[in-house]
Regions:
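C-terminal segment of classical bacterial N-terminal signal peptides
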Residues: 34-43
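N-terminal targeting leaders characterized by basic, low-complexity, disordered sequences
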Residues: 1-2
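Domain-terminus/edge residues, biased toward the C-terminal soluble/receptor-binding domains
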Residues: 172, 183-188, 192-404
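Active-site-adjacent loops and short helices of periplasmic peptidoglycan-processing enzymes
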Residues: 43-206
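Sec-dependent N-terminal signal peptides
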Residues: 27-33
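Bacterial N-terminal signal peptides that target proteins for export
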Residues: 5-27
Length: 404
């Protein structure tokens, strides 16, 4: 397997772990907890399938939720990303602080012939929220232009902010000429930049994450409620798909996608495809390869007790320490050992409620596998047998053994 104890962050290994010897039963219990929660997921096969098969993509990439590259082809090639542009449009709009539910006067905007449009024109009004939904689901180019004007007063000013934001995010192979992604000289990005953008958008803005998962959206266009279908076939057909955005130019197609299975989220991007179907086929190939080539491990469980600490404000009471979230990671079975680093409060330190206690990061062959943070709970642990810490620990040990 090449995994040296994915259960690595046992409290006995935490910094400042020079605890009294009578803490021993807790250490044994915690080791048991981690040994069980770190069992490999049966859904992820332990085979090396080589490289994924790509039929059309000139550039491709697949990463995990940490941003770790699992596979790439021409990751920094600068290629037309078409309507994937609209993810940055949404990011800039949401970061502007503009009122999503305010009503904005719309305009007649100039678009290329046959460009996808919802039908907005001067004399109509819309909320920014509805414009964003039409733009992200149906890829309405007129909606993207209206978003830009509503937020910045003009498309030009908005595009300037898009490029500034790209620089701030370190997207060094990305340049925008418009807010919608219609073909324009100098308008390009790379798969490495786009998965970074996509991961940021999906994890930072619930509106984006929830909208790109929709199969259709109904919005007012003038006085008519119009139902607009999603351009994303991937989100309708691929198990675990989350979104996020399609792209189609005059000569190439593209796709930025995300999916989640067994607690692990993947991001994939393909650029330079030649058909609408091919972009989805290649994305599926990337993700299928990742699921099958890596082993999934649960490295932290929010419901599992990690350790208990003495409560700072009440003698004899203790507070539980747990992971802040369930954390999974992908481990390459033929790679090197999985190791970890842990930074944590010294054992025995008086602890309040809902306070950070430590952070653990697992790595394999230099890549980050997963990161977990740990905090004290928001309630005191009930005392079942007097005030003794050992009695408290033994109670949890028995309860855990019975549950197992």
């Amino acid at each position: 397997m090449g995994v040296s104890t994915p259960t690595a962050c046992r409290p006995s290994q935490m910094s400042g772990a020079g605890a009294p010897s009578r803490i021993g039963p807790l250490l044994a219990f915690v080791a048991l907890v981690f040994a069980l929660v770190a069992a490999p997921s049966p859904a992820l096969a332990k085979t090396d399938l080589g490289e994924p098969t790509l039929t059309e993509a000139q550039a491709a990439i697949v990463t995990d939720q940490e941003g770790t590259v699992l596979f790439s082809k021409n990751p920094d090639a600068e290629i037309n990303m078409a309507s994937i542009t609209k993810i940055m449009t949404a990011v800039v709009a949401l970061e502007s602080g503009a009122d999503l539910d305010a009503t904005y006067e719309l305009h007649d905007v100039t678009l290329a012939e046959n460009a996808m449009a919802a039908g907005y024109h001067a004399g109509m009004t819309s909320t920014l929220r509805d414009l964003l939904r039409a733009m992200l689901v149906y890829s309405a180019n007129d909606a993207a232009s209206e978003v830009a004007i509503a937020v910045s007063g003009s498309e030009e000013a908005f595009v300037q902010r898009m490029n500034e934001r790209a620089q701030e995010m370190g997207l060094s192979h990305t340049h925008f000429e418009n807010p919608h992604g219609l073909d324009a000289e100098g308008h390009h990005s790379s798969v490495s930049d786009l998965v970074t953008l996509g991961r940021y958008a999906m994890t930072t803005f619930p509106l984006i994450a929830s909208t790109v998962s929709l199969h259709s959206v109904t919005v007012p266009v003038g006085n008519v409620q119009v139902t607009l279908p999603s351009t994303d076939e991937f989100v309708r057909t691929y198990p675990g798909a989350l979104g996020i955005k399609t792209g189609a130019g005059d000569y190439v197609t593209s796709f930025l996608g995300s999916a989640r299975r067994d607690g692990v989220t993947l991001y994939a991007c393909v650029l330079g495809c030649t058909t609408r179907e091919g972009r989805f086929t290649d994305t599926e190939s990337l993700m299928d390869w990742a699921w099958k080539s890596y082993d999934g491990y649960q490295l932290a469980s929010k419901s599992g007790l990690v350790r208990v600490e003495t409560y700072a404000l009440r003698f004899g009471q203790v507070v539980a320490v747990n992971a802040d979230a369930d954390v999974w990671g992908l481990v390459w079975p033929n790679g090197g050992p999985t190791t970890y680093t842990m930074t944590a409060n010294s054992r025995g330190m008086l602890t309040g409620l809902s306070e950070p206690v430590g952070v653990c990061q697992w790595t394999q062959d230099g890549r980050i596998v997963a990161t977990s943070s740990y905090s004290s709970g928001d309630k005191l642990v009930p005392t079942y047998t007097g005030f003794g810490l050992i009695d408290q620990i033994e109670h949890y040990t028995r309860a855990f053994a019975q549950a197992a």
